Amino acid sequence: MRTSIFFVFSALACAQSSLERDVARAIFKELIEINTTDSVGDNTRAAQAMAARLKSAGFSDSDVVVLAAAPRKGNMIARIHGTGGGKPILFLAHLDVVEARREDWSFDPFTFLERDGYFYGRGTQDIKDEAALYVATFMRLRREGFVPRRDLILALTSDEEGGPNNGVKWLLETHRDLIDAAFCVNGDAGGVQVQGGKRLLLGIQAAEKTFYSFRLEVKNRGGHSSLPEKDNAIYRLSEALARLSRFTFPVRLNPVTQSFFERTGALDNGPDAADFRAVAKAPPDAAAAARLSGRPIYNALLRTTCIPTMLAGGHAENALPQTATATVNCRLVPGDLPDAVQREIVRVLGDPEVSVTPARPSVPSPFSPVPRELLELAGRVGSEVWPGLPVVPLMETGGTDGIYLRVAGVPTYGIAAAFTDLDDIRAHGKDERIAVRAFYDGLDFDYRLIRALGTDTGIK
């Protein structure tokens, strides 16, 4: 009799699992097929669709809202009420995606396609996968009647990829009470790192570099191109950029990157392991840092970087240029201040005729100290889905909406659930895709993680 009961319950559990997968897939498909690009897309439509999904699972109208700073720029905020055991936890994903042209893809980027073990479509990696997983998980928790110790908030936002109406920034400025939290779990960063099909680690992103661009400009009186002069705006700017290309900012680790190199050095048996451990020391070993700097990813983790990304000059092919400009994009490590970086660029260029002004300023983001309790909880949950996977704090070289939350005093930790092989990164590119198994593994992980965080009392 016990055996029979076991098989009945096992079959029911499998049916429930299949149901949850079907729901998550349907949500994912719906999101992919709503164009949410800045140019012609409609983030509000996607936000309203997700609100309708949550209400169908039992969320009240008062617990799911859609707010927009501008037409087509909607943000959805949903809340599961807890017993008041602490400040809420915020779960964050963005609904907008970068542009995608049909002629660049092998198929329509806004048609959800499953083929050969992959889901295809714009946003499958960045990051409608995570938005779908969060919505599916919140729906499941509501249906199960789960009551957390503190409120759980889900925010799906606009204009993370660009555009004038960044949802997180706007919500913090105008509706902070809706998303204020003890800390945020950001689905746009961190997560399982996989390479060549091998899972390496579960990363918790606790820092990110600040995007900050400068405009370099040289002005000249110009003239007729038949009467050339050595004093040429393009020459002068080129020579200044050549000096910048030979400059390297000093190594500047923070507790997050120091812990990353220390932990990965202990885990890795490869040729870089000894250098990881050496660079994690105080002070970092200079020779080890020099060797690691030869790899773009490690160089970017070790220091602030500045690189020219755009050039313009002249006004006619038969005229000497009166102006030449360059955009230099910098990624600042936490602790490096824009004014100091600007002064260093001016010093390196060494030419008072080259002006340096902020082109796209932003607010530097601090790092978020990672509580031991969060590392341990993430490790336990991760091991339930991917046994034996180590947990490592990390800093990402790109930027996310976590910068606004950290500046506002909300510690933010990137823990993406659906992973992508490092050899198959297609976010922002052609034929974006995610492995079907990775998506469903992420569904399992997010459910376990959100439920565990909602039950835990040790993480402040």
Feature map (PLM): residue ranges:
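An extended, acidic, His-containing surface patch that forms the Zn2+-binding/catalytic region
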Residues: 84-86, 192-193, 252-315, 322-323, ...
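Hydrophobic h-region of N-terminal signal peptides that target proteins for export
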Residues: 7-15
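A non-catalytic alpha/beta surface segment that caps or lines the substrate-entry region
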Residues: 37-86, 109-113
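N-terminal hydrophobic or amphipathic helices/low-complexity stretches enriched
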Residues: 15-41, 55-61, 101-104, 208-211
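Histidine/acidic-residue-rich, glycine-tolerant segments that coordinate divalent metal ions
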Residues: 149-232
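Active-site metal-coordination/substrate-binding segment of hydrolases
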Residues: 86-156
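Short amphipathic alpha-helices in soluble, non-transmembrane regions
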Residues: 231, 341-349
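A short core secondary-structure module
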Residues: 169-170, 226-250
